[in-house]
From Swiss-Prot:
Annotated family: Belongs to the class-I aminoacyl-tRNA synthetase family.
EC number: 6.1.1.19
Keyword Transmembrane in record: no
Keywords assigned: Aminoacyl-tRNA synthetase, ATP-binding, Cytoplasm, Ligase, Nucleotide-binding, Protein biosynthesis
Organism lineage: Bacteria, Bacillati, Bacillota, Bacilli, Lactobacillales
A Gene Ontology molecular function term of the record: arginine-tRNA ligase activity
Gene Ontology, cellular component aspect: cytoplasm
Short sequence motif named 'HIGH' region, residue ranges: 121-131
Localization (cell): Cytoplasm
Protein name: Arginine--tRNA ligase
Length: 563
């Protein structure tokens, strides 16, 4: 039962002048729980009813009579609703126990496709913490939309094309070793790439040699293509090892190269629609009517196509292939102008679905307040970071629970979960400063804190040998259990809000609040004592663990049963 809708229905029945949706938008959550669970301000009725809001509130209170409310009070211009704790706790616990991990599952998406462009590292470049944000935000959004009944397609749009491959081919032919590349693909390819960039300062002829090899690659030269494919395959194998560590997979690895033969169609379509203009020898699309000052550069004066041309081809291909309801691009804030241009050009081409393209931007990860940069050597690589997080998690588990049987597997779940959760708890439009010690802490607003709350509840349930029954009428009416019940009941709404705002941090913050509320309850309540409320308290514990586990799962974080 949705409290807000119930209250809106009650008020609409006695105030026909107000629509239910209007009332819903006016409902507020009181700052103090002693003031009720929800409040309706009557200011908007003063004009039509020609009375002071305080009088309106007093008169309306007397007309509301529903067993769903413990009491309804007029406090000044507000009508404060106190929900019936016993009745609602029984309903909520029954629903969670019955549905288990399917609690909060919805059919909003009706099976429609959502395409998510995420991660997208560059071939032959190391996978750093900077790449993590797009990867974990995109994966969490995929889980969230699936929970709401959408089908999702996760596309890893690899950076697998460009002039740097000419450089890489020259570098490999001069200094490369097949054995070394096979042993450590990313490290070795990066080493020779850095070397050739340094060498070109004193040997500019290497630059021309690299351009020549890239021309060969564009013209499907057999040797150039074979080397490019090998670099790509070796790099992808390395990336997939890291993705497996993170517990993340993809539906497509179609990267930049995939669209090489699809860009000319875009240029032709733009020409046919009369959208191309010449500017200093280049072909551009004017976007001033969309409030975009700079035109979209489609083709350079030398005939080379550009990044936006490739993205236009990708968007059109994805619409044709997946018929998406939404196409989400999880890409940093620095690309905001690019995606505005992309949407505007698609709109100019007459594609009504351009409105379904969504740039989900995010802030930077810094270290000690400094921007991370591969070129400057100020970079945090993901693989050693995961290893260190797992090591630190294992040390804490050794202290807390030295006899834990599968502690290495648990430490991996905690270490990886800590890194992902710390990223996802931050509002995505904000950046955060990388702090591994804070990430893996079992205290504070962290992934391990939430995981530990879940493991603690599982321990309680094992001790009690408790098996919840959906047919039982579990009821609670104390203040601390009520805070937990309200949070659990709000979980479905939280998921919808997270999807509407493309904001996984709402799920992470929810999980933190639920874990905190349960820990407070646990500190003040003897759950296992023999009392009339024992089974209801255990049912509440079970429901909390179920929802915590599901919230973590939406973020791509495991919830160990023991820690």
């Amino acid at each position: 039962m949705n409290h807000n809708r119930l209250i809106a229905k009650e008020i609409a029945a006695i105030v026909p002048a107000l629509e239910q949706e209007t009332i819903l938008n006016l409902l507020e959550k009181p700052k103090k729980s002693s003031m009720g669970d929800l409040a309706f301000p009557t200011f908007s009725l003063a004009k039509t009813m020609r009375k002071a809001p305080q009088i309106i509130a007093s008169e309306l209170v007397g007309q509301i009579n529903n067993s769903y409310f413990e009491k309804v009070e007029a406090v000044g211009p507000y009508i404060n609703f106190f929900l019936n704790k016993s009745e609602i706790s029984a309903q909520v616990l029954k629903e969670v126990i019955k549905k288990r991990e399917d609690y909060a599952q919805a059919a909003i998406g009706q099976g429609h496709n959502i395409v998510i462009d995420l991660s997208s590292p560059n071939i032959a470049k190391p996978f750093s913490i900077g790449h993590l944000r797009s990867t974990v935000i995109g994966d969490a959004l995929s889980n969230i939309f699936q929970k709401l009944g959408y089908e999702t397609v996760k596309i890893n749009h690899l950076g697998d094309w460009g002039k740097q491959f000419g450089m890489l081919i020259v570098a490999y032919k001069k200094w490369g070793s097949e054995e070394a590349v096979r042993a450590h693909p990313i490290d070795e390819l990066l080493k020779i790439y850095v070397r050739i960039n340094a060498e070109t300062k004193n040997h500019p002829e290497l630059d021309e040699e690299a351009r020549e090899w890239f021309r060969k690659l564009e013209n499907n030269d057999e040797e150039a293509l074979a080397l490019w494919q090998w670099f790509r395959d070796e790099s992808l194998m390395e990336f997939n090892r890291l993705y497996a560590e993170l517990g993340i997979d993809f539906d497509s690895y179609n990267g930049e190269a995939f669209y090489n033969d699809k860009m000319e169609e875009v240029v032709q379509l733009l020409a046919e629609k009369g959208l191309l203009e010449e500017s200093k020898g280049a072909q551009v699309v004017n976007l001033e009517k969309y409030g975009i000052e700079h035109p979209a550069l489609i083709k350079k004066s030398d005939g080379a196509t550009l990044y936006i041309t490739r993205d236009l081809a990708a968007a059109i291909y994805r619409k044709r292939t997946y018929d998406f309801a939404k196409a989400i691009y999880v890409v940093g804030q620095e690309q905001t102008a690019h995606f505005k241009q992309l949407k505007a050009v698609l709109a100019e081409m007459g594609y009504a679905w351009s409105k379904d393209i969504q740039h989900v931007s995010f802030g930077l990860v810094t270290k000690n307040g400094q921007k991370l940069s591969t070129r400057k050597g100020n970079v945090i690589l993901l693989e050693p970071t995961i290893a260190e997080a797992v090591k630190r998690s294992l040390a804490q588990i050794d202290t807390k629970n030295p006899d834990l049987v599968n502690k290495e597997a648990v430490a991996h779940a905690v270490g990886v979960g800590a890194i992902k959760f710390y990223d996802l708890k931050t509002d995505r439009t904000n950046g955060y400063d990388f702090d591994l010690e804070a990430m893996v802490s079992f205290e504070g607003e962290t992934g391990p804190y939430v995981q530990y709350a879940h493991a603690r509840i599982q321990s309680i349930l094992r001790k009690a040998d408790f098996q919840p029954q959906a047919t039982e009428n579990y009821q609670l009416n104390d203040t601390e259990s009520w805070e937990i019940i309200k949070l659990i009941q709000d979980f479905p709404n939280t998921i919808v809000r997270a999807a509407d705002n493309f904001e996984p941090s709402l799920i992470a913050r929810f999980a933190i609040h639920l874990a905190q509320s349960f820990n407070k309850y646990y500190a003040h309540t003897r759950i296992l004592d023999n009392s009339p409320e024992r089974d209801s308290r255990l049912a509440l514990s079970y429901a909390t663990a179920t929802v915590l586990k599901e919230a973590l799962a939406l973020l791509g974080v495991e919830a160990p049963n023991e820690m």
